[in-house]
């Protein structure tokens, strides 16, 4: 809303065949490590949370929102100039079809997505449930396809701990924290009980890292330094650096090299731009065969980029990465992370 010449170690997952006999690369299965699965009520809560805590996002990403929701950009911009809620109404007008889980899964299958980590939220829906509760109930029968990573707000440390415990008991498989929406520093010792509980429960934490547009909060919230502090203090905690800490990708990658529980996930950024000089992603590609090989996850953020997930995966394929790296980044590392977390939960 981020020494590479040595042999890479195996991540413990089977490597799919990604080069056909004719020399054409065949895309392996995709795991979307940063997905948003909401009905319209959930999307309204999501957009309102952005508007209340980081209204810049409704402006900066206006074209992306309109493209995703099929809304008129002109009508949206006109509404946003008057009242934020009117702009949300343009995106989510009455009469939109209800969320259809079967249709969602069918689309995921068409895009080659075999699993997704769906990010939740502790915000309340009109019916009184949290978004986390709705999501956990909605995907209860398809947890092999959709794993819920429950959203937490660190504004209330005790409340965050209670939400973690409730969500874990209901089947959550990870957690999601967005510091710039809370205005909190995750590395503050006040939150240590939350991270200790996450580690003990085998719940990886997706943490928004790197650049953000919320002018009311400092840019350092969720930096590589945050991840370094958390990983050093909570050695058993599994951390996913959402957006890979961009533009400080090299520092985040070096942090991951120091801490075996840290992973980088590059949602919101298009793979096709990564090789361009000045993109900030050069370190990831330079170290792809070494320290980055088993630490990078593919993600989308769902609404940010144009086009379907399969197209983004194809952009990754076009980078001409070694077959084993391409497979690891697209799904192998995410599957290995999920298996590692499951092993902790199993005791």
Predicted features along the sequence, with ranges:
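Mid-to-C-terminal alpha-helical segments outside catalytic/metal-binding sites
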Residues: 1-31, 40-95, 102-106, 165, ...
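Conserved, mostly hydrophobic/aromatic
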Residues: 34, 135, 167, 198, ...
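Active-site gating/metal-coordination segments in enzymes
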Residues: 112-221
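Short, well-ordered alpha-helical microsegments
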Residues: 132, 157-160, 248-252, 306, ...
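Metal-cofactor-binding active-site regions of metalloenzymes
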Residues: 62-156, 289
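Histidine-centered divalent metal-coordination motifs
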Residues: 34-42, 208, 243
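Short active-site segment of divalent metal-dependent hydrolases/proteases
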Residues: 37-38, 211, 246, 304
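Catalytic pocket-lining loop regions of alpha/beta-barrel enzymes
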Residues: 172-179, 183-297
